[in-house]
Design a protein with these regions (language model features):
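Catalytic cores of nucleic-acid endonucleases
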Residues: 93-142, 150
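Short secondary-structure capping micro-motifs at structural edges
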Residues: 54-63, 67-74, 96-103, 116-121
Length: 175
């Protein structure tokens, strides 16, 4: 039986110009280091480049319930907007760290669709990257790969990509 050939994901580096345009149109710009450490990242030397804090944008624009949204977005050199969800706390609280709680596929789908709906009224001048990046801590990355492989199963083009903070920074901010 022939296996389906999965397309490779091509990720473009961070674009200061596009991100500045997005930050101007959406407001809620925040230094990457502040956002990642606020989400639970434990990496040193995180750049100060600006990203858009989508959770803050969602809180500011929703009248009722806060829509489910990704944590951040930024512009890339291929004129696409990269959506990123931080999942550093899948290990739970201190006592429960041994049992990992994966994000559900439905939860991730809702975050992407709610984010796109939140941004749909804005003329952003760029499309969305086809992949949602999921950032995990180093100690959870192997399990995260298994989850993401399950989420992408049967898809010709992957919809999710797992990364550690170091991989993320090397791919987008130190290419």
């Amino acid at each position: 039986m022939a296996q389906k050939k999965r397309l490779q994901i091509s990720l473009a580096p961070y674009s200061t110009e596009l991100t500045k345009v997005l930050a101007h149109k959406l407001s809620h710009a925040k230094p990457l280091s502040d956002l990642l450490t606020g989400e639970g990242a434990k990496t040193n030397a995180i750049p100060q480049d600006l990203v858009v804090d989508v959770d803050a944008l969602a809180r500011a624009t929703s009248l009722g319930d806060k829509p489910s949204s990704v944590d951040m977005l930024f512009g890339c050199t291929n004129n696409l907007i990269q959506l990123v969800e931080c999942k550093y706390r899948v290990g739970g609280k201190k006592r429960d760290r041994k049992s990992l709680t994966p994000p559900t596929k439905r939860e991730l789908e809702n975050k992407v669709s709610d984010t796109k709906q939140l941004l749909s009224r804005k003329d952003l001048g760029a499309g969305f990257a086809p992949v949602l990046l999921l950032l995990f801590s180093d100690r959870h990355i192997e399990q995260a790969r298994a989850w993401v492989n399950d989420y992408n199963a049967g898809k010709k083009t992957p919809l999710y990509k797992e990364m550690t903070t170091t991989d993320f920074l090397d791919t987008f901010f130190h290419p």
